[in-house]
UniProtKB/Swiss-Prot annotation:
UniProt xrefs under SMART domains: 14_3_3
Subunit: Interacts with BZR1. Interacts with ABI5.
Function in brief: Is associated with a DNA binding complex that binds to the G box, a well-characterized cis-acting DNA regulatory element found in plant genes.
PANTHER family, sorted: 14-3-3 PROTEIN (PTHR18860)
One Gene Ontology biological process: signal transduction
Originating species: Oryza sativa subsp. japonica
Family: Belongs to the 14-3-3 family.
GO cellular component: cytoplasm
Protein name from the UniProt record: 14-3-3-like protein GF14-D
Pfam families listed in its UniProt record: 14-3-3
Biased composition regions of type Basic and acidic residues, renumbered to the chain: 251-265
Region (Disordered): 244-265
Length: 265
């Protein structure tokens, strides 16, 4: 006799345990199970704020480790090519391909879940923006390492998702809302890193920052910490992007982190 399928509550609890143990692949499995169970419910039930945040944290950690690995390996590859070490460079390219296959598998997994369950079941504006931003993020991660037509397609999909999220955010979320600010942060990073459009990146980031600062006095205590943190990241990127040409470019561009608690971005 096969064991009973775990309940939604059991899967959420196991995901929390996996997070504490830093076993993020298992955390992804548990939260995918929750998302599919909710999406398969009558009418497609929406995830709770806690559940969607757990899903985001799980995937952000799984993808984040591979993105960091890819950057390190790509840097080593460039150095070996510069030294003329063709044999080493070929070995590194093969190893980079393995990491890229893992990145693609992870991105394809969450993008399929977003399209089949999460975006269609999202009712509130906040949820729609959250998931569309997430969709844009994972298409952007594909664009980071793809080339040619695949990169172009990933960039177009990123733009479409971020633009759809932005349209809803501008209409329905306050300028100080952490999810709206996180969207602006990541959208501006997309302009800068993927589209090589520093002017558009700076304009988007500055507008989001200025609009939020003008309404900061009306911000509730609950969101104040979250919002001001992302505003600081927007400012950090603006400083980096507008710094003089003598800068060594060693500073890291900031993105919106996965939420740690309900409401965080």
């Amino acid at each position: 006799m096969s064991p009973a399928e775990p309940t939604r509550e059991e899967s959420v609890y196991k995901a929390k345990l996996a997070e504490q143990a830093e076993r993020y692949e298992e955390m992804v499995e548990y939260m995918e199970r929750v998302a599919r169970a909710a999406g398969g419910a009558s009418g497609g039930e929406e995830l709770t704020v806690e559940e969607r945040n757990l899903l985001s944290v799980a995937y952000k950690n799984v993808i984040g480790a591979r993105r960091a690995s890819w950057r390190i390996i790509s840097s080593i590859e460039q150095k070996e090519e510069g030294r003329g070490n063709d044999a080493h460079a070929a070995t590194i390219r093969s190893y980079r391909g393995k990491i890229e296959a893992e990145l693609a598998r992870i991105c394809d997994g969450i993008l399929a879940l977003l399209d089949s369950h999460l975006v269609p079941s999202a009712g509130a504006a906040e949820s729609k923006v959250f998931y569309l931003k997430m969709k844009g993020d994972y298409h952007r991660y594909l664009a980071e390492f793809k080339s040619g037509d695949e990169r172009k397609q990933a960039a177009e999909s990123t733009m479409n998702a971020y633009k759809a999220a932005q349209d809803i955010a501008l209409a329905d979320l306050a300028p100080t809302h952490p999810i709206r600010l996180g969207l602006a942060l990541n959208f501006s990073v997309f302009y800068y890193e993927i589209l090589n459009s520093p002017d558009r990146a700076c304009n988007l980031a500055k507008q989001a920052f200025d609009e939020a600062i003008s309404e900061l006095d009306s911000l509730g205590e609950e969101s104040y910490k979250d919002s001001t943190l992302i505003m600081q990241l927007l400012r950090d990127n603006l400083t980096l992007w507008t710094s003089d040409a003598n800068d060594d470019g060693g500073d890291e561009i900031k993105e919106a982190a996965a939420p740690k608690e309900p409401g965080d971005q």
